[in-house]
Amino acid sequence: MEIDTLLGAFRDFEKKGEKESCPILDQFLSHVAKTGETMIQWSQFKSYFLFKLEKVMDDFKASCPEQRGPANPNVEYIPFEEMKQRILKIVNGYNGIPFTIQRLCELLTEPKRNYAGTDKFLRGVEKNVMVVSCVYPTSEKKGSSCVNRMNGVMFPGNTSAFPDRNVNGPGTPRPLNRPKHSLSSNVATNGLPDSTESKEQASEQSERTVNESSASEAESHSGAVKSKHRDDEDATHAETHEAKRLKFDKEEEEEEDDEEEDEDGDEIKKELDEPHSPCTSVAESSSDVPQSSTDVTAEVKDEDQEPSSTQSEVVENGVDRSTSEDSPDPSHKATGSESDPKEQQAEEEEEEESAEAQETEETNDPVSSSSNNSSDEGVSSAETPSASPSSSTELPAEGSVTAEITSDNSETADDNMEQD
């Protein structure tokens, strides 16, 4: 089929005042129904397509009367004239060839092939005309080998062959420059006229976007607040953990200080206890020494004196007294060990002075009896051991002094006996 003959036939149809069917144009519609190839522009065969569509609907109603049975409650009933005018208005608003052109041509060439009732036929036609995508005529693309088509729709990959044209029709905007709400903003650019329903949909979509944006902002704000609260909680947790750690360290330091103080107190007690033991040992040793000194004095007396009953008794009495006085009690040991060195020295000096005073008295009084001498000797010998626990270093010297004193006293006593 040649394009020139088709264009001439369409021009002749438009020039006629009375619209009639044309066999050449009907053959063109049958060719499109079989192949889906439109060789001319939409504006060139639009008028004949509208004429043929209206004629087919009228013929279908005339040949097929309306349904006499009860209407389907699930389907809205629309009168024939109203449905016909709606379909014609939609098709008249196209700016390009709809991508369902092949199916529409099938319905125009063979209307009773799939439909028996007028209502169902009109609904089928309405479903195929309510589209927004458009296609280009096939003859324009014969020179290109990279055309990708599916059901008459071009894909963006074909734009390289036609850089000066849009993908979905001459009246549609380019995909790169298309706004987010292109369908709701201007529906007529894609082949359908503007309507109140499209405007309502546009307003609803804009309200949804505003609500979504406000919700996202609220979520972001709440997320920021939550993150801030989390940071505050982390900071407070860290502070409490640090405070607990410092408190634990302080308690450990206090325990260590207490342990050190206890150790120092134990050492001080040990140091205080150590000096007492040598004192007691010295006191014990000194208590042993006087006994030996008294024994020496008793032996010296026995050797120097002559045998007499009075002297032996005196010596025995003196020895008994000295032994009784030489046995120091625990209280004496304790006092001697606890007395200071200065006090011990003072006591020793006093005892020495008293001993010297007794010696001078004995030498000056030759008339004194032997019994008195012996008693004095016993007293002096008893006094010397009592002072001996205070110092262990002077004990031997004191023992020698007492021995000399007793020897002198024994000589004076012998002289007195001879004189009597």
UniProtKB/Swiss-Prot annotation:
One of its GO terms (molecular function) is protein phosphatase regulator activity. It comes from the Eukaryota. Regulatory subunit of serine/threonine-protein phosphatase 4 (PP4C). Residues 182-195, 278-296 have a biased composition (Polar residues). Residues 251-266, 346-364, 411-420 have a biased composition (Acidic residues). Belongs to the PPP4R2 family. GO terms for cellular component: cytoplasm; nucleus; protein phosphatase 4 complex. The gene is ppp4r2a. Serine/threonine-protein phosphatase 4 (PP4) occurs in different assemblies of the catalytic and one or more regulatory subunits. Residues 212-224, 368-394 have a biased composition (Low complexity). It comes from Danio rerio. This is Serine/threonine-protein phosphatase 4 regulatory subunit 2-A. Residues 196-210, 229-250, 267-276, 318-332 have a biased composition (Basic and acidic residues). Residues 157-420 are annotated as: Disordered. InterPro entries: PPP4R2 (IPR015267).
